[in-house]
Amino acid sequence: MATMQSLLTKVLPILISLMIGRLLGKFKLLDAIGVTTIKTLVTRVTLPFVIFQAFYTVDYSLDTLLVALCVLTICLALFALGFTLKKFVRNLTLLLPFTLTGFEMGMLGFPLFLLLSGQERMGSIAVVDLGQEIFVFTIYLFMLRRETGSRQSLPEAVREVIKNPVIIAVLLGLLVGVTGLGRLMAGTLAGEVVDGVCGFVSAPTAALILFSIGYDLRLDRRLLSRAMKTVLLRLACVLLIGGGLTFLLFQLIPYDPFLLLAMLLMLVLPAPFVLPVYSQSPQEAEFVSMYLSLGTMFSILLYAVLIIIKPMIVG
């Protein structure tokens, strides 16, 4: 009964929000421009508040560094495996290495973990996200632009990263957390004000993200088989490499059930949603969008599995 209640209270809101997004598009209440505006609002305003609050509440230690290095290693290993497999698997996508690595933490990971574990445990997903952010905003995007012919000078790339509100939120959160200012504010009026502002501004983030994802969900029968093979290939690679390195990580650091939940959630997430933007052709962009839609559906399904096994992990 408790498991069914958890599924209903944590998965049903997600499914309904996705359905609302789909219906908004079907009945022309929302168009592509509107969805772009929603995504801009989320990524530049509400999501940075979620991320800042998560990062500044982390209790940073050597274990934090080990987790970040583990996640970075997972991303790099999957990336290298993608380039190796690309030589043998030529009928899926030219962007195969980029479909196998990277995780959509911002637009999907943070909102799902918030529903799964609550605001007080968001520090766990922040620790996991640190290594992933380093990978995506440096190696992943640099190589993706290079692969797709979107040239950009190093100074331009650095400026773009520094000006990104998500990165600013991460850096500010790290600054407040690492210096101990976050601990000093805990339980004080200043801490309550910061948490209150962050909580209020970030409140609509999950719903807005899910509306936009629901609008973008596309299942094209022509591309279904190829997209399904790519999704299953990613899941197999992530299970092998991500699962193995996660097991190794917890041999090196004390067991933390919510950190394990955060790691597992990251591993079931789809590739970064930015991928279609850099596709070389409309056909490739169409396939990548289909792949991400299918990957998102698998992520929701596996998220439901996480909800079921959460009592066994947390105890």
For the regions a language model picked out, list residue spans one by one.
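Alpha-helical transmembrane segments of multi-pass small-molecule/ion transporters
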Residues: 1-315
